[in-house]
C-alpha cells in the first residue's frame, strides 16, 4: 500500500509540473504576443505621424523674381505690373516691371495675379490646442490667476495640423497668446513653417496679457437671480488686486532681489519698455481705469484688445499712443441695442478717430477660424474701410502693434521675404487662391491634410 501511494504521489506531482509548465508557456506566449502587438502599434503610429507631419521648407538657395503681378505692399501703396526680387530670405527690389534691372534666379510670371505680404494673426492661440475635446492637447490656459511668467512659446506645437491649415489662405505668422486668469501670461510671435518652437519664433515674449475686470455684472438666471446688468460691487476690489500686484512687482525689481520671485521677474520688460502690456478690456470705464492706473504705475507701452466703447475714449487712446486690436468682423452685436451691422463697421468708426487698428482672433472656434483672417479684413473693407487700409490691419498695422514691423508686415526692401501670390483678391473668398507662398524666402508647401482630402473626394465625384 505504501509503495502504491508513493507511485500515485509521483504521478500527481508530474501532472502538476506539466500543467504548470504549460500554463507558464502560455503566459509567456501571451506576453510575447502583447509586446509584439504594442510594438507594432507604436511603430504604426510613429510612421503614420511621420508621414502626416508637415515638412518645413529648406533654406533659400537661389533668388526669385516675381514679375507682372499687382503688388499690394501693405503700406497702402499698390504697384501694377510689378517686379519683386528676393534672395537670402530678404527682399532686394520692389518696383515696376518696366525697371531696367537684371532679373535674378527663378522667374515667376505672375501676370494677372496679386502678391501680398504674409498675413499676421494677432491675439491668436494657434498651436496651443489641437483638439478642444481632448484635455491633453489643451495648453492655452494655465492654473492660477496672476501668471506673467507663463510663456506660451514653449507650449507652441509647430507641427499642429491646425497651424498648417492657415497657410493656404496666406496667414503665415501669428501672435501665440495664452488665455485665462487675470494675468494670462506672455505671448510670442512665430512664423508658420518650422520644425519646433525655437525655429518658429520671430519675436520671443513680445507682450504680457491681462484680462481687465468688468464693472458690470449679471445675476445667475439659472439660480433665480436677476439677469439684468448692474454694477459689480467687487469691481474696485478686483482692480486694486491688479494695481497692488504690479506695484509689488515694481518694488521687487528695484530691490536687491535676494529671494527670487519668478512671476515678478517676468514683468521686468513692462517697466523698461521692452515688452508691451495687452489689456483685454471692454467699456469706457474699464478702458479709462486700465490706462490711467497702468500709466501711474509706470507701464507705458500699452495695447488695447477688444475695446468695446473705445471710440468714446478715443482722445485718451490717441494721447497715450495706444493702438487697438479689435475682434473679428464675423460676429453678432454685443449689446441688445447695438446696430445690427456694428460689428462690421467697428474698424471704420475707430479708424475715423485716428486710432491704429489691428485685427485679433480671440473668440469662438478661434484656432480654426484664424484661416478666415483675410475675409474678416475684407468684410471691414466692405463696410467703409478701403481695401488697402483693410490689408494694413492684418499686415503692417499688426506688425507695428506686435513690434515686428522692422522686418515683416510689408513688401519693402530689406524686409523678410514672407509673402504669397494669389490668383485674385486675397481679401475675397473667390479670389483667395494661392499659387505660391514664401516664408523668409523659403518656398513652402500649400498642401495640408484638408487639401488632400478635398482633392481625394473631388476626384471621386468628378464627372468624365
Locate each region found by the language model:
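Glycine-enriched alpha-helix->loop->beta-strand junction motifs that scaffold or abut catalytic
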Residues: 294-301, 318-325, 354-356
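His/Asp/Glu-enriched, well-ordered alpha-helical/loop segment
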Residues: 68, 131-132, 137-143, 149, ...
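Divalent metal-coordination and catalytic microenvironments
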Residues: 69, 84, 89, 112, ...
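C-terminal cap of metal-dependent C-N hydrolases
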Residues: 69-72, 80, 412-457
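Bacterial Sec-dependent N-terminal signal peptides
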Residues: 1, 5, 9-13, 18-59
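Polyanionic/metal-chelating signatures
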Residues: 162, 169-301
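Histidine-rich, glycine-flanked metal-binding segment
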Residues: 71, 75-116
